[in-house]
Amino acid sequence: MKPLFQISNLRKSFGTNLVLDDVSIDFPAQSTTVIIGASGSGKSTLMRCMNLLEELDDGQIHLDGSDISAYGIEIDSVRAQIGSVFQAFNLFPHLSVLDNITLAPRLVQKLKKETAEKLALELLKRFGLEDKADAFPNLLSGGQQQRVAIIRAVATNPKFLLLDEVTSALDPVLIAEVLTLIAELKSEGMTMVIATHEMGFAKKIADSVIFLHHGRVHETGTPAQIFEAPQSQELRDFLGALHQAGRL
Amino acid sequence: MTYQPSSLQLQREAAKRRASRRSTLIALASTFAFGTLIAVVITGAQGYEKVKASFFNWHYAKQALPSVAHGLLLNLRVLVMAEFFVLLLGLLIAIARTTTSPVLYPLRLIATIYTDLFRGLPLLLVLLLVGLGIPGLRISWIPNSAVVLGTVALVLTYSAYVAEVIRAGIEGVNPTQRQAARALGLSQSQTLEHVVLPQALRNVTPPLLNDLVSLQKDSGLISVLGAVDAIRAAGIQTAQSFNFTPYLVAGALFVLLTIPLTRFTDWLTRKQDSRQRAQGQW
């Protein structure tokens, strides 16, 4: 079976700084892929290349069999099929929670206001946030804001979801509520790519783990292979550092 | 058991009360001394009686008020029109300057030249060039009324200022907001309309209102083109009586006109400050 999302020979540099070097990854439908690696290993750039927020220097990206990295592609319509959630939530501060969630469905998917709001309220209810529909983002806790940001991405009915360090700005209690939501999305069959420092969570939720080192895919495998039997010295060093920091 | 403040706390509160009483007394005494000093200097000046007679004459003030107030109605009409077009044109220029598409390069270039030019030219010069130069062209369909041309000159100058304020607001919106909107699939123009502009305009409302206050008073400058506004009406009165009090009347009316907007601006700024503090930002 062809993978839902496929990166082949991706290369990206900023000036003379080569950030991603010949990266090739397959993301099967309904799988959860976790990307780990030290700061500066290229995780965020990889995520930003995947939703075309960065221009590629070389290589190809296929979504559902079609080349979305082709020159002259309708970038807006590609992005509408990919849900992205960022470390800093990036909710729109001038819009209520409900309006944050319905903005893209109304403008991009052209849903009627009532349809979009019904859908949004259903999602909010499912994830225990229905009483926050009319609140503005600044009145929510960090964990609530990030859950709203994830719901906002899911509401556009994306083919898959990119989660870039979505818990890095949260304290442990709030991290738990966000991770619970992500686990629920996985159980519903959402295809996800997650860049994270939460190794415990990565072990539990990942179907496959990718260790990025100096812009290259250094090691891939199941969580058991990556965390219990690391092959390369670099991965052992990385896991050792996490262990010392109490993150593993 | 009910709470009883400790004797230490009672002492502290008493000391605080004493200090605040002392501050009030000092402020009163200082204001009184300062006021007396100014009064003595002015009333003691050699030409005081003459100035008082030619600038603060109650008789002429009453006489001038109706025609000056009537002139102010013209200022009001001018500034309502001018404010509308200033905001509209300023917004369009600001948007033009923040576009990135190569097709729109000429538009960006024109907008840049426009703001550079009209922010640099003294308003009085623009008024004279537009008000006297355009009628000189003798193009039949262009109105040559001083009021219309004066308004055009005000709009030209002030839209350049307002455009820069709005552009600063647009560029002040965090780039991650734009990124989040684009990641959701919104187009460039949808992002501008629904995400960037609402935040930008909210952030620049106080400086924007400040420019409008300035526009209100500068609407008096159209009198140089011969429009009978408040200042021109005061001038006519002065020419008849050789007394300058009508100018003071016009000045007082302009101040009264701007005070509501100034207070509104202050109030809005305070409100925004406190809202941001409530959000725990900065």
What are these model-derived regions, one by one?
Chain B
Residues T2-W282:
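Transmembrane alpha-helices and adjacent helix-loop boundaries
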